[in-house]
């Protein structure tokens, strides 16, 4: 196509490369094209501004011209030679985009822009480490094509946005990790000459609810959203910041042309779908999406939609499809009436976190604040569903004007719910609290509320005093109670009861038995100490022998004999015992212990030498 076929009022192409690596590309609004520019290593910031200083009549003429809407990118670049080209940079900037990369959807519906407003439509691509290649970026920016489905035409990413946000224009953020795109099966086959990124989203036509639009002019919709996404703590807070935006008037050039509006708005794809391969997704992820429709249920009405599950060929759940409905269709237009514009609806998304097996956050579902969204969006006649590939990050304020969206959020790993465990006092989980712990921490009493812990503590204190006043030991009390009550009332039980190192139920069981026995022992003590000993019983007949202590001289003699012979005979042991004036059994045991000590020491040295 020659350059003279272009409209005379085309705006010049301005390429500005700033210090931050951003480029500003301007092109006419009626040319439905996308200019993509990227570096070798990183994605630079692209700002595509639409020069709206066009008359409505000129826009209508260019919209009716079939050749004007289907012109290629090379023709646009040649047309810019007539106008001034401004480059503010110390380095050269080269734009290399082949003709097949840019896909144009022919539209017979004219789009007239109000000449009174200057509308800029920037697309900011945030740079991230090791980002997309030139071919991948061009493919992502030009659109998506469904494999073997009714979407037989390439779809342009809709870029038209009303007005400016905060004086900088509405932002449509595209941030994608680079390295993972090449690892996905079916996505690496894009030819360098300009193949499209083909994402097989079959059955997306079921997600649209289309209504015919009257040929007269629609009321202008004014909307802006400036969500503040600063930190992870603020993800659960939603807020709406509304401002006045420029009005865009859309009309049909021919009354016979049926223009459709998409009520469910566009399609927002979570970028985690791109990095699904690196996070453990199955290779059949893409093929499963092709063979299995994403949306299986009929959508006669937007309200009442439920989430859908996306599974691979093995039946494993790899993603969910939460369909976000407009609250205005359920609870009325009360929220929308508070906004300055009539055609606005408010959508609230509750944030959810997706964690991998290592506990790292890999994606968020619906982490955007409350958004003021236009209720209708125009759709090109040949495009069934407009697709918008976006990603919202928490690095800064990002504004996105989009209708109610369908979010595809794959789940490479199981979502781990975060639970908080509260420990009552110093009581560890899985352990029964003792009486002492419960008395010191009254708030920890649960099932023991019916037990008077203070009474048990006072009784344990008095029981010890009364036992000592009778001259009885814990062993004597335990022996007497074991003979009459059973082994549960041994000396160790008496010791733990006096120290309150016992559970409330056990203490409640011991208390009446100890109280009855102590009262009876005091009665026997009044009759005489001898009667008390008869009642209690003598000390256990089996006593532990007194530990033998060797003098340093005896130890030296024993070590000397041990160095000569570590295993003496019985006669030698008897002679050594007579010499040292010790019992023969004591000397024999010493030699046994000394040999065992040497054996254990030798084992330790062997391990240390290794």
UniProtKB/Swiss-Prot annotation:
Function of the molecule: Transcription factor that binds with high affinity to the motif 5'-TAATGARAT-3'.
Pfam families membership: Homeodomain, Pou
Presence of keyword Cytoplasm: no
DNA-binding region per Swiss-Prot/TrEMBL record: 543-602
Gene3D superfamilies: Homeodomain-like, lambda repressor-like DNA-binding domains
SUPFAM superfamilies reported for this sequence: Homeodomain-like, lambda repressor-like DNA-binding domains
A single Gene Ontology CC term: nucleus
Region called Disordered, residue ranges: 55-87
Keyword line: DNA-binding, Homeobox, Nucleus, Transcription, Transcription regulation
Tissue: Ubiquitously expressed during embryogenesis.
SMART domains assigned: HOX, POU
Chief location of this protein within or outside the cell: nucleus
Highest taxon of source: Eukaryota
One Gene Ontology molecular-function label: RNA polymerase II cis-regulatory region sequence-specific DNA binding
This protein's name: POU domain, class 6, transcription factor 1
POU-specific domain sequence ranges: 448-522
GO biological-process terms attached to the record: atrioventricular canal morphogenesis; regulation of transcription by RNA polymerase II
Subcellular location: Nucleus
Keyword Cell wall biogenesis/degradation: no
Family stated for the protein in its record: Belongs to the POU transcription factor family. Class-6 subfamily.
PROSITE patterns in the cross-refs: HOMEOBOX_2, POU_1, POU_2, POU_3
UniProt cross-references to InterPro entries, sorted A to Z: HD (IPR001356), Homeodomain-like_sf (IPR009057), Lambda_DNA-bd_dom_sf (IPR010982), POU (IPR013847), POU_dom (IPR000327), POU_domain_TF (IPR050255)
CDD domains, A to Z: homeodomain (cd00086)
